Amino acid sequence: MSRYLARYMVSRYFSSASSRPLHVCIVGSGPAGFYTADKVLKAHEGAHVDIIDRLPTPFGLVRSGVAPDHPETKIAINQFSRVAQHERCSFIGNVKLGSDLSLSELRDLYHVVVLAYGAESDKDLGIPGESLSGIYSAREFVWWYNGHPDYSSLKPDLKTSDSAVILGQGNVALDVARILLRPTTELASTDIATHALSALKESSIRKVYLIGRRGPVQAALTAKELREVLGIKNLHIRIKQTDLSVTPADEEEMKTSRARKRIYELLSKAAAAAKTSEADPDQRELHFVFFRQPDQFLESDERKGHVSGVNLQKTILESVGTGKQIAVGTGEFEDLNCSMVLKAIGYKSVPVNGLPFDHKKGVVPNVKGRVVSHTSGDISQTEPGLYVCGWLKRGPVGIIATNLYCAEETVGSISEDIEEGVWKSSKAGSKGLMQLLEKRKVKKVEFSGWEKIDAKEKQMGIERNKPREKLVTWEDLLAAAAN
């Protein structure tokens, strides 16, 4: 039997017209979850897909992670909304895996469970002083200015001094630097949370330091994001000329990567332009600080328990293997004073009970999206009916579109397993889930509830001349959904 015919026969077996629909549950309503749902619905005409999320709002980091001054990136929401409105798809928000229901209960209810809940925690540096107040992860800061209900009450210290330090030089670091330095008049017409805009208007921050362990050639950012921050009005760029010196190893890296060469050229051009112009005392400054790594955080003498700076160790690059250079500490140290530190060193996924998890890599062990319970030699034992997609599958890397290919691979594995006849028993699916949630008095938010939230936010936005005014507390979100 051909592969096409086998897939057709399986699709007919799990037909919506029969008593054996294929019940699929996707945990997480970000890009990975919606792309997976879309591909499952297209591949299997008998599939019924439920997308659950702990938040009452769908779309994951497209809503809470994308910077407010990047509205074009949020266009993906239109496609995801069409998926959620599909007759064989349901969004069920305000349902938390691990507390409202367990993974084992989901697996009992559905033929297929796909975990796509991303990375909602942060990597730690593991250095002294990391618990001082005034130190935040970039994720916390991003969720604060994007109106995430978990962080709407955050009070980042923007007024104690004129300096903030960002550890990391990737695109997330550039995002938070841009929000700190961009004129608030330009942010006012975006969907930035009002509490964040008000705080930024009163901010004393005038100098932002972007700290990287390696050099400008190795900076983990993209030219598009860099050009945007370099183009901020009345922003003075500062880069030490010595940091722009390149070695033969750097030259080799740029030969093999046009992107790295372009980044270096943009930084060099910005540094040269800054040398020929005098800094206005009222200008804001963005300092790119290379070849430094944090050794410890310094505590304020005046404000006990609060950060007052970062002790940095100078680094040099050493070649390891072909074309790769790593940062090595030199034993020389210097202090950099600040009142706020943002750690943009990476997101981290968290496990749930009953889920195999690689704590070192921060991912669920998997083979092409199939969750692996244990491995012996070259043989991997997989968990029947349990799959993973997105950051939980591959780590917190890539852009929104990366999840499209990731979902394609996972759904390919699901289809192969269906063809092999892995599931032949009936499952309760949506009906069983709704009964369980009702029994536990969980206030679920369906897509119609989200549409009420969406309509209210847009209406409030019209009144304030912005795309939307986000509801930023759990109470307000749930009240709007139930209205």
UniProtKB/Swiss-Prot annotation:
It is found in: Mitochondrion. Its cofactor is FAD. One of its GO terms (molecular function) is oxidoreductase activity, acting on iron-sulfur proteins as donors, NAD or NADP as acceptor. Residues 1-14 form a transit peptide. Pfam families: Pyr_redox_2. FAD binds at A32, D53, L61, L97, W391, G398, I399, I400. Keywords: Biotin biosynthesis, Electron transport, FAD, Flavoprotein, Mitochondrion, NADP, Oxidoreductase, Transit peptide, Transport. GO terms for cellular component: mitochondrion; plasma membrane. The keyword Transit peptide applies. It catalyses: 2 reduced [adrenodoxin] + NADP(+) + H(+) = 2 oxidized [adrenodoxin] + NADPH. Belongs to the ferredoxin--NADP reductase type 1 family. Associates in vitro with the adrenodoxin-like protein MFDX1 to form an efficient low potential electron transfer chain that is able to reduce cytochrome C. Functions as accessory mitochondrial protein involved with BIO2 in the plant biotin synthase reaction. This is NADPH:adrenodoxin oxidoreductase, mitochondrial.
